[in-house]
């Protein structure tokens, strides 16, 4: 039976019921709805709606229902209830009779669902942060094992300057750290309890909402009832954070796909995260990484959809807001799956020390070192930049690396170049000189790894 049937003289058409009902997806809020109902039952005691004995009967029945839900959440879908709130109430009435009908006193589904989705989001933030820390730890571990693996760094997908594989790993640690921080910021803003806001104007019962918030593990009660039932900022914030983090994961996946390609051959992905071709027996495809890359649009689409849902809504609650759930459920599930899969991809990765070094030696990635060398000899940087550019053109023409040119050849472009130039053109020198904080020098990378290990203990 619908919770709102008294006003109506005709039965709901089945076509509308199928269109309107949300149990098929909001069943995922069952635990939160039950926990919120237990909290509300305690609050009703303080305003003499329930006796202590009645509250205990309700709490026992709700706790029993919670155990049933946790053991088999899919069982909920066998019911014909309109939504999860209707389902919980009907099951409670089945267990305790008419006493169950008293629970909704002073409460609206508007503040009820606002509570449920906030509680669910808070729980998912904690789970996502745990998964992100696991990925960060795996990146740090991979970096630690590959500190001396030299590879080309790229701009415009052209070889630019030598870096290490460890430095590459630590770049993604930093990206994920910002994502983690954004989750923490969002958590703090969503940590306010809307229960007791009623439909929009607040509950008519003198409930201590701060005590209720504390009982439900919120930092405080919301300050405005109208805003409380209208607010879906926390969903949009999480979708925004998820979208940005998925973009980071997509960049990681793209790098791995390139590094794993036959053209680069820097890394080999495990058989456990790759697949083959139905036609070409030699193929080993990086499907895990490609799927991470491909799922970004799905998450960004959920963000865009939610923004469009709320952009024109008048205060307070509107049924449009039912559209918040499927998007956030799917987006955060997808995000967590991708974070976990990225961690799995790194578990058995093999890095080719020889191939990465060979690639780093090509492409004249030590050109900047030669320009800096000339600056140290008193040549203005703009002039040195031009001199090195001409030198590279010559080196390409004669099929030599800069380090292979003779002093006589160097002197065609600048007499400031002397025998000591060869010391600074080595890959190791290129790395060592980048010794400012955050740079690629082995010392700085080792410091970054050590610091990250302390943070992620």
UniProtKB/Swiss-Prot annotation:
GO terms for cellular component: cytosol. Its EC number is 4.3.2.1. The keyword Cytoplasm applies. Pathway: Amino-acid biosynthesis; L-arginine biosynthesis; L-arginine from L-ornithine and carbamoyl phosphate: step 3/3. Keywords: Amino-acid biosynthesis, Arginine biosynthesis, Cytoplasm, Lyase. It catalyses: 2-(N(omega)-L-arginino)succinate = fumarate + L-arginine. GO terms for molecular function: argininosuccinate lyase activity. It is an enzyme of class 4 (lyase). It is found in: Cytoplasm. It comes from the Bacteria. InterPro entries: Arg_succ_lyase_C (IPR029419), Argininosuccinate_lyase (IPR009049), Fumarase/histidase_N (IPR024083), Fumarate_lyase_CS (IPR020557), Fumarate_lyase_fam (IPR000362), Fumarate_lyase_N (IPR022761), L-Aspartase-like (IPR008948). GO terms for biological process: arginine biosynthetic process via ornithine; L-arginine biosynthetic process. PROSITE patterns: FUMARATE_LYASES. Gene3D superfamilies: Fumarase/aspartase (C-terminal domain), Fumarase/aspartase (Central domain), Fumarase/aspartase (N-terminal domain). Its main location: cytoplasm. The keyword Transport does not apply. Belongs to the lyase 1 family. Argininosuccinate lyase subfamily. This is Argininosuccinate lyase. It comes from Histophilus somni (strain 129Pt). The gene is argH.
